[in-house]
Design a protein with these regions (language model features):
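Active-site mouth of glycoside hydrolases
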Residues: 1-215
């Protein structure tokens, strides 16, 4: 699978109604771990059902779902079930889905062993982006890194990407793949080889949908 031509991209775009929507996360989710973990799943889906109905009512027709590697790492089977539930609810409410496979927002920091965030009850921190406090002075001194920059984690990250893309490569409910959200916004030029590796991983699964990376 190669990069689409400009004509093919415009033909695809013009074949769709005006795409309008939002990044979707239920209002009862303290953060993205809360969105994707199995803990509290039934309650999360009830709220998502109501709020995706609101999306439909106000004229949205597409939403972005941003994956969470730390949850997938700890609950890979359950994670795929939760993803399917979200996509099914979106389809029920006439919302196509853009799946975001990686983003540089709130990368882990440091040079020691990576420890994924604990699952279970998540605490709200009102007034901050995605319910998380700003970095402390000590945290700011630590170097941010992408999971793909750690060899032991990179293999697992690629496995997650391939697993998700393979399952939905020919699914009409998926509008497109946001392979990398805002590459370089945190780690600058270090994002370039990661971008290449992720595009290779996605394209190896031969998705029929377009693949994007927004600046």
């Amino acid at each position: 699978m190669k990069k689409w031509s400009e004509k093919k991209a415009w033909d695809w775009y013009n074949s769709h109604r005006w795409i309008r929507g939002c990044n979707f996360i239920g209002s009862d989710c303290a953060n993205r771990i809360d969105q994707w973990q199995s803990y509290g799943r039934e309650e999360r889906m009830e709220v998502a059902d109501r709020e995706l109905q609101l999306c439909e009512d106000i004229g949205f027709n597409s939403v972005r779902l941003i994956v969470d590697f730390e949850v997938w790492l700890q609950e890979p089977v359950s994670y795929m079930d939760v993803l399917e539930q979200y996509i099914s609810l979106c389809d029920k409410h006439k919302q196509s889905v853009m799946i975001v496979l990686t983003t540089e927002a709130q990368l882990p920091r440091g040079d020691g062993e990576f420890v994924p965030k604990a699952l279970g009850e998540q605490k709200y921190v009102l007034g901050y982006h995605q319910g998380r406090l700003p970095l402390t002075e000590e945290q700011q001194k630590l170097k941010p890194y992408h999971f793909m920059e750690r060899p032991d984690l990179a293999k697992k990250y690629i496995k997650m990407v391939k697993t998700i893309v393979k399952k939905y490569a020919n699914d009409d409910r998926v509008l497109c793949w946001n392979v990398y959200n805002e590459p370089g916004i945190t780690i600058r030029e270090r994002s370039i080889p990661i971008l290449d590796m992720l595009f290779d991983a996605v394209r190896s699964q031969k998705p029929k949908q377009p693949c994007t990376a927004d600046i």
